[in-house]
Amino acid sequence: MKRLAMSIICLALAGCAVEKTEVRTPTFDEQLRPAPPSYANGSIWQASTTGLAVDHKARSRGDIITVLIVEQASASKEATTDTERKAEVSASVPYLMGLEKSSTLFSKLTNANPNNLLGASTNSKYEGSGATTRKENLLATMTAKITDVLPNGNFLIEGRRNVKVNNEDQILVLQGTIRPRDVSPDNTISSTMIADARISYTGNGVISDRQRPGWLMNILDYIWPF
């Protein structure tokens, strides 16, 4: 009887389940797709005909440009610190109104010497050194789109490339501002000519997760006092 009741309850709950509706996110291309221009077809030149002398460089919103990413950077720094401090204090009472010859003055002190009553010295020394070296090298080729044309004629570009191999995502994102005159005749531009460049090359997957320390190790490193 209990099994029958449980079966009825399960069927009732299954019938009340709401079907999950997947929300479609607009693609990158749809977000930047410009409105198609309208042309009047003539008897000689059609709208789809390419001009005889046409510059194929990107110039309008939505046009594609090829970016040659060549980023090389190296830096090194070295620091050395050496400090030392010495202090010495001594005191003696060779003459004290004739009392230094009195046997009662130093009677309570064993082996007391008035010429050497107090002596102290301190010595502090610290040495430290450090060095750091960093080198980066990123070579890639990707295409980007003109997202906006500024009033001064410069272009805002943005590109994204996602490559997935064996459930490992490699994501390359580029953003920046370029000048039209820096674009070569073959519609390419070097990343060194991009102002306010933001280049990100990251990865998601098992390999990327294994390269990061665990959460407990991060906590121990944060609170470890030594």
UniProtKB/Swiss-Prot annotation:
Topology of this chain in the membrane: Lipid-anchor
UniProt entry keywords in alphabetical sequence: Bacterial flagellum, Cell outer membrane, Lipoprotein, Membrane, Palmitate, Signal
Gene from which this protein is expressed: flgH
Signal peptide feature range: 1-15
Protein function: Assembles around the rod to form the L-ring and probably protects the motor/basal body from shearing forces during rotation.
Lipidated residues (S-diacylglycerol cysteine): 16
Protein name, UniProt field: Flagellar L-ring protein
Locations listed in the record: Cell outer membrane; Bacterial flagellum basal body
InterPro entries, per database record: Flag_Lring (IPR000527)
Native species: Geobacter sulfurreducens (strain ATCC 51573 / DSM 12127 / PCA)
Lipid-modified residues, N-palmitoyl cysteine kind: 16
Keyword Membrane on entry: yes
Subunit structure, as described in the record: The basal body constitutes a major portion of the flagellar organelle and consists of four rings (L,P,S, and M) mounted on a central rod.
Cross-referenced PROSITE patterns: PROKAR_LIPOPROTEIN
